Amino acid sequence: MPNTSKLTVLILAAGYGRRMGPFSRMVPKALVPYDNKPLISHIMEKFDPCTRFVIAVGHMGQYVKDYVSAVHQDKDIQFVDIENYAEGNTGPATTIQACEKYIRGGGFMWLACDTLFEFDYKDKLDHNWIGVHPVDSSVSQDYHWVERDGEKLIEVVDKKPSPHAVDAFVGLMYAKDDEYLNNLKERKAKQTPEGFEGLELKVHSIRKWQDFGTYEKWEELSSHLTDVSFPKPNELFYNDNNKIVKFWTETKHAELRVKRAECNPEAMPNNVEQAGNFLVHDFADGDIVYNRYTLPVFDKMLEWGEKELWKPAPTNITEQDKQKTCYKFYHDKTMERVEMIRTKYPNWSEPCVVNGQEVLSIDQYLDKIDWDWLCKETSWKFVHGDLHFDNTIYQYEHSTERPSNASIVNQTWWDEVAKKGKHHFTAIDWRTDFGGELYGDQYYDLAKMLGGLHQSYKDIKSELYSYKEKDDYATIECPSVQNVKEYELRLEKWVQANGLNWRKVKLLVPIIYLNMSPLHEAPFDKFLVALSQFHFAKVLDV
C-alpha cells in the first residue's frame, strides 16, 4: 500500500462563491456552515491527522486564514494567496498552478472547497484518478461530465446537456506525480480537465458526494438537519474541533466580547480569544440549562450568578453615569428598535387584542413607562447581557449512581441528590457591552431569566411557536418552562431577598421582547411585538 503518512491535499478556496445567497456577503464559500461546521472543516476531517494541507485563498481569504489557524492549530497547513482571483483570466487550473511550489515533487490530491465526499482513497495513491458521481440529465449542463469504459476515461464533456444521466466530475482528483502539473503549465490551462490530455488516468465512482455549489443546494442538503441555529443578520455560529466559534461581519463584536470576558474569566469558557472577525473559545462540557431543568438547578444557577457571575463593578462609576447608561440602553435603544419595526412594516398596526386580552399600542405603553424610575437605583455589576437558559452551560457531578428503577424514583429523592453534588455553570454567548460599558444593570440579566421562563427560547429555536393575526386580533403560542409559576416564585423571592425591585424586573421583560423583534424575520418579529404587548398589559394596565 502506498505511504499516506504525508499526503498533500490542496483545497481550492479562492473563488467568490457568488451563488451562495446571503452567505456571499458574509464569508467565502469555504466557511459556509453545514451542520455547525464550515465546509472546509468537513473536508479536512476526512483525512488523516498527519495530512499536509495547502489552502489556496483569495476572496475574503483572511477570514479563511483566521478561522483555520484558530481552530485547526494541530494540523500542518500552508496558505497560498491567489492574486487576480477576481479577473476573468483565472480559473481552478490557474489556482493549482499558483500553488506549484507547495505541491510539486510528489503526489497530491486537490478538491474544490464546496465538495464533500465519502470515498476510500488510501489504496488508490499509486495512479492518477478523478472522482465522478452520477447526476440526472436535467442538471448535466451544470457539470463537466465524463464518458468512460469502466475505469478508463474516454472523454471529458464541458458542461453540455445530455439526454441521459451522466457521471459528473465532482472536482476531486489525485495526481501521483508532476505530470498533471506539467500539462496544466504547458497548456496555460484555466480549467482543470485541460490537464487530463495525455495523462494515464482512471475514473473512480464516489460513493457519496454532496455539492454545495449554490445556496439552493445548501438549503436542500441542510433540510434534514435537526440542530437548528437561530441566526441573526451578519452573524454565524460554528461548533468545530472542540471549539465554539462565532463570526460577525464587524470585528468589534469579537473584540468587545474578549474584553468583557477578561473582566470575569471565572464565569466564562476557557481560552476566550479573538481571531479577526471570529470569537473563539473552548467547548464547555455539559448541557444548556433548558435541558437540565429542575428547581434545585434553578436555585444553584442563582447561587452561581450571585457568587461568580454578578461580580461588583468598579467603584469609580458615578450614579449619574449609571443612570445615563441605563437610559441610553433601555429608552434610546428601545425607541430605535421601534423605529426599525415601523420602517420594516410601514402599514402595519399592532393588534388590539392578544390571546383574548385587550392591549394598548406599543406607543401608548412606552408613554406609560416612567423611564427615570426605571433607570434609577440600578444594581451595577458584571452582567451576562443575554442570560437566558440557552446561553448557560450546566454540568453536574455526583457520586450517586442512577438506580435501575429510576423512572419510578420519587422526584424529591433526585432533588436531594442534586443538592449534594457539584454544580458547574459556564456563561456563553454574552453581550458585547451594556450601553457601551463593560459593566451593567443586574436587573437586565434577571429580566432575561424571567423572559426565558415565560417563553422557552429553546422551543422557539425549534420553531415550536405560532403567530396568527386577523384584523386587530392576534393569537400567539409558545411553550413556557414546565411549572413556570414555581420558578417565577423562586426568582421573585430571590430578587426581594437581595433588596431588588420585582416590578422593575417584570417591566423589563416586555421591553426586551420588543427590542428583539426587528432583529428577526417574520413571523417571529410580529410574534415578539404581540408578546411584548401582552406582558406590558400585565405590568402597566393595573
Regions found by a protein language model. Give the residues of each.
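N-terminal glycine-rich phosphate-binding loop and ensuing alpha1 helix
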Residues: 2-64
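Conserved alpha/beta core of the MobA/IspD/sugar-nucleotide pyrophosphorylase nucleotidyltransferase superfamily
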Residues: 2-9, 164-240
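Conserved beta-loop-beta/alpha segment of the NTase-like Rossmann-fold superfamily
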Residues: 69-148
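Conserved core of the sugar-phosphate nucleotidyltransferase
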Residues: 116-191
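Conserved kinase catalytic-core helix
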Residues: 263-268, 289-385, 497
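Active-site acidic catalytic loop and adjacent metal/ATP-binding pocket
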Residues: 366-440
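Active-site activation/catalytic loop segments of kinase-like enzymes and analogous catalytic loops
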Residues: 420-425, 431-493, 510-524
